[in-house]
Amino acid sequence: MTVRTRVAPSPTGDPHVGTAYIALFNRCFAQQHGGQFILRIEDTDQTRSTDQSEQMILDSLKWLGLTWDEGPDVGGPHGPYRQSERKGIYRQYAEQLIEKGHAFKCYRTSEELDALRAGLKESGENRALKPSDLELPADEQAKREADGAPYVIRMRVPTEGRCEIHDMLRGPVELDWALVDAQILLKSDGMPTYHLANIVDDHLMEITHVIRGEEWLNSAPKHKLLYEYFGWEMPVLCHMPLLRNPDKSKLSKRKNPTSILFYQRMGYLPEALVNYLGRMGWSMPDESEKFSLTQMQEAFDIQRVSLGGPVFDVEKLSWLNGQWLREQSDEQFLDSLLDWAFNRDYAMKIIPHLRQRVETLSEVADKAAFCFNGMPAISEASFEHKQYSADDIKVWLQYLLWTYEARNDWNREGLFADAKAIADALEVKIKDFLFPVFIAIAGTSASFSVVDSMEIIGSDISRARIRHAIEVLGGVSKKQMKKLEKAYRDLPVG
């Protein structure tokens, strides 16, 4: 048997360090066993998936050295490797389940589903919706079918008993069938959900080991059941502990920069970031803190993974990155510096905005410094405004941060539209509203267009700088945050 592992990111935003973390452990496991590592793109969410995001994922993983044997860019015998290009395959298997009596068409409306869930809550029943709750009387089913009403395909699940899952790290895990819902397999637009697509793809792509985040452990009974329904052998499951913020909460962009691009633009070495991710819940046999990808692959043993939630601490990553930098030769350091600071693609984004604003090349370093720096050197005094207080400005920035955190695509038109919508809702002139954004992003209001600047430096650095500015202005307490969240929800935006 050839060991085959995979990573299957969704191209719905910036490439996440969590994707790199899972890719790293999948790649190391495959390498350890002389196997193959596959990259598959989960782009079934057509409203949020973008080609730009997919390319950033590919570029970021390559930058880290986490290359793959098969994937959408390199091809392979099990393609296509984008789920959107496999739509017909999923429908074929979903209909096969209906024919075998393992799935059914569900014509329930969203209002009916809400009422069913409310009924369960009122009755105090601690269980999920089951086929018996969802199936309509035969005459009503026939009527909706004849009317061409939209439907989804759901799987049948047991109503009682327990399901035992074997996990490589945890051993046997028991889960209650009562809490497992009649999962949607095929949506009304014909696209599959994660649950159907991954089982079908993992089988057809001959995946032998599924190494994924522990958030999928509760879904494992559905997956085991689908393998049984199809009569397929189930891959070995291994659920990795989730990355955590220093406060032990799940790693999220609201508390920590999560984009690989952020760390690339901030000047972290790819070797250091891979090294740090390798220490997330795993350790070398000799307990060494600094090691290369090659060294990790040679010493890798999945059983050395600890189930305690590994903490992703940027300060510790910075310390480790410093260790890597200090051990470089002068030539290596110069090469790293030139590759980072004079990256041609990045520089070409800046130059069109810079060329019109300088008279000598010696001015470039000062005017473009914010494109290369970390956090701008700002104070509360930097935000002084004739008409608005620091508290006013702090609220604006918090509203803008929340809006930008919800944005999937990152372009100047969308960024400006978001800022304008909030300014209009607050009845603030856009010029006044953008003043503190200039300060937060560039450290000065004497810069080229702030939306152009944010598009250039990217989403994670932009959000991190706005978050930093809010802290400089005194931050927001938990009590204030609740009030602001309500006020933000009530904003007449859009």
From Swiss-Prot:
<dbReference type="InterPro" id="IPR049940">
    <property type="entry name" value="GluQ/Sye"/>
</dbReference>
<keyword id="KW-0030">Aminoacyl-tRNA synthetase</keyword>
<dbReference type="InterPro" id="IPR004527">
    <property type="entry name" value="Glu-tRNA-ligase_bac/mito"/>
</dbReference>
<comment type="function">
    <text>Catalyzes the attachment of glutamate to tRNA(Glu) in a two-step reaction: glutamate is first activated by ATP to form Glu-AMP and then transferred to the acceptor end of tRNA(Glu).</text>
</comment>
<dbReference type="GO" id="GO:0005829">
    <property type="term" value="C:cytosol"/>
</dbReference>
<dbReference type="Pfam" id="PF19269">
    <property type="entry name" value="Anticodon_2"/>
</dbReference>
<protein>
    <recommendedName>
        <fullName>Glutamate--tRNA ligase</fullName>
        <ecNumber>6.1.1.17</ecNumber>
    </recommendedName>
</protein>
<comment type="subunit">
    <text>Monomer.</text>
</comment>
<keyword id="KW-0963">Cytoplasm</keyword>
<keyword id="KW-0067">ATP-binding</keyword>
<dbReference type="GO" id="GO:0005524">
    <property type="term" value="F:ATP binding"/>
</dbReference>
<dbReference type="GO" id="GO:0006424">
    <property type="term" value="P:glutamyl-tRNA aminoacylation"/>
</dbReference>
<feature type="binding site">
    <location>
        <position position="253"/>
    </location>
    <ligand>
        <name>ATP</name>
    </ligand>
</feature>
<feature type="short sequence motif" description="'KMSKS' region">
    <location>
        <begin position="250"/>
        <end position="254"/>
    </location>
</feature>
<dbReference type="InterPro" id="IPR001412">
    <property type="entry name" value="aa-tRNA-synth_I_CS"/>
</dbReference>
<dbReference type="InterPro" id="IPR008925">
    <property type="entry name" value="aa_tRNA-synth_I_cd-bd_sf"/>
</dbReference>
<dbReference type="GO" id="GO:0000049">
    <property type="term" value="F:tRNA binding"/>
</dbReference>
<keyword id="KW-0648">Protein biosynthesis</keyword>
<dbReference type="GO" id="GO:0008270">
    <property type="term" value="F:zinc ion binding"/>
</dbReference>
<dbReference type="InterPro" id="IPR020751">
    <property type="entry name" value="aa-tRNA-synth_I_codon-bd_sub2"/>
</dbReference>
<dbReference type="InterPro" id="IPR020058">
    <property type="entry name" value="Glu/Gln-tRNA-synth_Ib_cat-dom"/>
</dbReference>
<keyword id="KW-0436">Ligase</keyword>
<comment type="similarity">
    <text>Belongs to the class-I aminoacyl-tRNA synthetase family. Glutamate--tRNA ligase type 1 subfamily.</text>
</comment>
<dbReference type="InterPro" id="IPR000924">
    <property type="entry name" value="Glu/Gln-tRNA-synth"/>
</dbReference>
<dbReference type="InterPro" id="IPR045462">
    <property type="entry name" value="aa-tRNA-synth_I_cd-bd"/>
</dbReference>
<dbReference type="InterPro" id="IPR014729">
    <property type="entry name" value="Rossmann-like_a/b/a_fold"/>
</dbReference>
<keyword id="KW-0547">Nucleotide-binding</keyword>
<dbReference type="GO" id="GO:0004818">
    <property type="term" value="F:glutamate-tRNA ligase activity"/>
</dbReference>
<dbReference type="InterPro" id="IPR033910">
    <property type="entry name" value="GluRS_core"/>
</dbReference>
<dbReference type="Pfam" id="PF00749">
    <property type="entry name" value="tRNA-synt_1c"/>
</dbReference>
<feature type="short sequence motif" description="'HIGH' region">
    <location>
        <begin position="9"/>
        <end position="19"/>
    </location>
</feature>
